[in-house]
């Protein structure tokens, strides 16, 4: 478990990845406290002066013009949390909720939200205790923020809802007891500040980003394995080709392949006098395809890194002037578009990998035994494993349709254009799982192909990757129950061990 001293607005992608992948304890930097207190004081000043300001002493959405009496302000905060906790579907994973909470703490602590330190410390205490609110996956359109998910996240502050602790569902009362907390009463604006924001969609999109990075690394390593297994040419990775085009992602991807394949190997030397003029695109154009995916991953990283540190509450409190201004930072269009781009990248990584599998099992193209097995006919080898990969790759093509182009008005047309960011981000987990499955099949196929090339040896990095797999899955000498092999290869990919094969500067969060 790592410990993070949080200076609001300074989270790095590496820190966010660590929070996403493991438990963390938080401590708020002392430098943040003054801004939090000043911001909360300005909200109290509005009430003391009897002014009417949206989000502080008014209704919400279409009811924004309804002024709320001072005696009803605490009830209003409770009511908005309870009424907006209207999500549905399965609960998000604890890791997702943990990240969502840290992002909300990060945003609230910047001093633009008019929320008391007591409320922020309550959320920090839950994170530190490892007690997480139960948040349904569905119910947000990504504007006005992620209202339903964040409402469920905040129910325990009121002593309501369910929580998760060490994999078990418990009541909010039990969860608060574990964390040493008691329910609190929210003051003016605090309910809206807690619920308004893009932290649910951003957390899901960041998880998608980290999965996409892992898949890019795996695609590079396994793609290099397939080049060796198919006795492919190294010339398509020549740096002069990629410099002539000038696409940064492509240039970097080609460099990764040169790093993985090395200058030469026994396999490549044996291939010198090959009569084949060119390799199929799935081998030859890997830098062009994977490089384009890398560009989308990097762009999404920039957008999501900014969003993770941004303030997406409404209205915002500006300490230098005392102004409280209503805007639309809750609209998650940047997150939705970043997630859409990640979806395309994840789908393409799986699509080209499936084509490499098809190449390897086709003896006319690879010059390997049909379906990568001896005694074909009696043995079917990788025949149906490739069908599985095709099914997964095709499923992702449907998932990759952009979500951000959809919109459905809500709140009696007051909220008449929305981002659909939460779905855009949420589907990335399923897409990543599908592409991981495709790559698992390719990993098995490439290793099998390399075994058929023996005694010729591949590059050092490719041999190492093959060796890691062979510690888990043996050579496929005859037909056997294939499912466990795919599962073992998938588990290997889930360790993200292939990230270490790439230079550190390639992926944004590493």
From Swiss-Prot:
It is found in: Cytoplasm. It holds the Pfam family Lyase_aromatic. NCBIfam families: hutH (TIGR01225), PRK09367.1 (NF006871). Gene3D superfamilies: Fumarase/aspartase (Central domain), Fumarase/aspartase (N-terminal domain). Contains an active site 4-methylidene-imidazol-5-one (MIO), which is formed autocatalytically by cyclization and dehydration of residues Ala-Ser-Gly. The gene is hutH. PROSITE patterns: PAL_HISTIDASE. The lineage of its organism: Bacteria, Pseudomonadati, Pseudomonadota, Gammaproteobacteria, Alteromonadales. There is a cross-link at residues 143-145 (5-imidazolinone (Ala-Gly)). GO terms for molecular function: histidine ammonia-lyase activity. Pathway: Amino-acid degradation; L-histidine degradation into L-glutamate; N-formimidoyl-L-glutamate from L-histidine: step 1/3. Its EC number is 4.3.1.3. This is Histidine ammonia-lyase. Keywords: Cytoplasm, Histidine metabolism, Lyase. GO terms for cellular component: cytoplasm. One of its GO terms (biological process) is L-histidine catabolic process to glutamate and formamide. It is an enzyme of class 4 (lyase). The modification 2,3-didehydroalanine (Ser) is found at residue 144. It catalyses: L-histidine = trans-urocanate + NH4(+). It comes from Shewanella pealeana (strain ATCC 700345 / ANG-SQ1). Belongs to the PAL/histidase family.
């Amino acid at each position: 478990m790592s410990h993070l001293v949080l200076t609001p607005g300074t989270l790095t992608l590496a820190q966010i990845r660590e929070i996403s992948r493991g438990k963390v304890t938080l401590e708020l930097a002392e430098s943040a406290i003054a801004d939090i207190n000043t911001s909360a004081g300005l909200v109290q000043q509005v009430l003391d002066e009897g002014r009417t300001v949206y989000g502080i002493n008014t209704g919400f959405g279409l009811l924004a013009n309804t002024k709320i009496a001072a005696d009803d302000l605490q009830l209003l905060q409770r009511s908005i949390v309870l009424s907006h906790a209207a999500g549905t579907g399965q609960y998000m994973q604890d890791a997702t909720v943990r990240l969502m909470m840290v992002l909300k703490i990060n945003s609230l602590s910047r001093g633009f939200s008019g929320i008391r330190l007591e409320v922020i410390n309550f959320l920090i205490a839950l994170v530190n205790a490892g007690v997480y609110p139960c948040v349904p996956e569905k119910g947000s359109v990504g504007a006005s923020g992620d209202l339903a998910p964040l409402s469920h996240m905040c129910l325990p502050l009121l002593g309501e809802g369910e929580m998760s602790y060490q994999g078990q569902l418990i009541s909010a009362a039990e969860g608060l007891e574990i964390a040493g907390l008691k329910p609190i009463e929210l003051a003016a604006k605090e309910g809206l500040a807690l619920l308004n924001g893009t932290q649910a969609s951003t957390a899901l999109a960041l998880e998608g980003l980290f999965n996409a990075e892992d898949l890019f690394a795996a695609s590079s390593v396994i793609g290099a394995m397939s080049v060796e297994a198919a006795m492919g040419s190294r010339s398509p990775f020549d740096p002069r080709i990629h410099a002539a085009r000038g696409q940064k992602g492509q240039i970097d991807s080609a460099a990764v392949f040169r790093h993985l394949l090395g200058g030469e190997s026994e396999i490549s030397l044996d291939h010198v006098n090959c009569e084949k003029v060119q390799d199929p695109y799935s081998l030859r154009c890997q830098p062009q395809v994977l490089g384009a995916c890398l560009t989308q991953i990097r762009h999404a990283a920039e957008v999501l890194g900014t969003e993770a540190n941004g303030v997406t509450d409404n209205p915002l409190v500006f300490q230098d002037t005392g102004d409280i201004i209503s805007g639309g930072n809750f609209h998650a269009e940047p997150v939705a578009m970043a997630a859409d781009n990640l979806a395309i990248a994840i789908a393409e990584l799986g699509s080209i990998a499936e084509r490499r599998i098809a190449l390897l099992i086709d003896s006319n193209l690879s010059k390997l035994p049909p379906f990568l097995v001896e005694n074909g006919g009696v043995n079917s080898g990788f025949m149906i494993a490739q069908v599985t990969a095709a099914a997964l790759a095709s499923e992702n093509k449907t998932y990759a349709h952009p979500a951000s182009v959809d919109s459905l008005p809500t709140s009696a047309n007051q909220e008449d254009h929305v981002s659909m960011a939460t779905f855009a981000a949420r589907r990335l987990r399923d897409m990543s799982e599908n592409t991981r499955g495709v790559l698992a099949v390719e990993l098995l196929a490439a290793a099998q192909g390399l075994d058929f090339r023996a005694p010729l040896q591949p590059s050092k990095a490719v041999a190492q990757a093959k060796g890691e797999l062979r510690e888990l899955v043996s050579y496929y000498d005859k037909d056997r129950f294939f499912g466990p092999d795919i599962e073992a290869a998938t588990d290997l990919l889930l360790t993200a061990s292939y990230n270490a094969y790439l230079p550190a500067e390639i992926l944004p969060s590493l």
